[in-house]
């Protein structure tokens, strides 16, 4: 930032800029530690993403400088790079928003060593975070995708709401969620954001919209054993092994578990497919490549 604004601010201005940046960043972190409101986490997360993108811009600008310094005079190069850096940050933010609002369908074919009358088409979507930023329009997109894919069953492994049902109710999203249907049903489990503050109301609203919420429960659906675990925040939740006790595991077994933290243990159980969410595909690039 000091480099970016150097032509327009003097030494004192650069000190003020450094002080303000330091105050904002550390003030937000202190606010997070003191738990000054639940939205503080989101504000801090957004600010950290901005700082990360600024770091990417600084790296890209430096690389461009190394490549172009032999071909451009100092002043034109300096002006060009000062224009490039903020545009690069804006481009990253715009690309991130585009990705967030543009769902991508990925197809996976899984073969299991259990008898099935016919192949099963399962639609999986997690971490919808229905709230201020994501709502009715995104639900309609999801419904259209599931219809186009002709899924037999829909699984929603957690974080359907963004902490509360306030925005869900205010924006009247229920009719849109009710349109999400499948021949064998729509099933959900609760994730950490469903557990934070409004667990009972979230579960109630999901069920009122026609979803079956599995909270540490097992359900047989057309010859398929469906297991749903609540989030790790449920300290009393039984293990997947305990949930499977006494169940007919000769049937195909599908597990919904919001966080994939126990996937190695589950691999040793008679579970054929586990679907999870939580990780948001690495959250921020380039973590999505890992």
How does the language model describe each region?
Residues 114-290:
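Soluble catalytic domains of enzymes that build or remodel membrane lipids, polysaccharides, and related
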């Amino acid at each position: 930032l000091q480099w970016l604004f150097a032509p327009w601010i003097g030494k004192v201005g650069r000190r003020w800029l450094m002080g303000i940046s330091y105050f904002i960043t550390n003030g937000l972190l202190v606010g997070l530690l003191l738990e000054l409101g639940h939205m503080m986490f989101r504000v801090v997360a957004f600010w950290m993403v901005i700082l990360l993108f600024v770091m990417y811009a600084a790296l890209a600008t430096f690389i461009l400088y190394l490549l172009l310094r032999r071909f451009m005079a100092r002043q034109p190069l300096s002006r060009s790079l000062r224009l490039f850096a903020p545009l690069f940050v804006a481009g990253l933010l715009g690309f991130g928003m585009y990705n967030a609002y543009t769902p991508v369908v990925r197809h996976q074919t899984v073969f299991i060593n259990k008898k099935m009358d016919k192949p099963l088409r399962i639609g999986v979507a997690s971490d919808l975070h229905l709230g201020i930023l994501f709502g009715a329009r995104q639900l309609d997109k999801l419904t259209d995708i599931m219809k186009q894919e002709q899924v037999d069953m829909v699984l929603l492994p957690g974080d359907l709401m963004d902490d509360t049902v306030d925005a869900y109710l205010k924006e009247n999203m229920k009719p849109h969620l009710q349109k999400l249907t499948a021949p064998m049903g729509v099933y959900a489990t609760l994730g950490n954001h469903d557990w934070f503050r409004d667990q009972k109301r979230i579960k109630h609203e999901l069920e009122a919209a026609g979803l079956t919420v599995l909270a540490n429960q097992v359900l047989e659906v057309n010859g398929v054993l469906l297991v749903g675990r609540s989030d790790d925040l449920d300290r009393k939740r039984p293990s997947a092994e305990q949930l499977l006790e006494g169940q007919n595991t000769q049937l195909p077994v599908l597990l919904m578990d919001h966080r994939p933290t126990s996937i190695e243990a589950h691999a040793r159980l008679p579970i054929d497919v586990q679907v999870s969410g939580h990780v948001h595909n690495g959250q921020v690039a380039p973590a999505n490549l890992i």
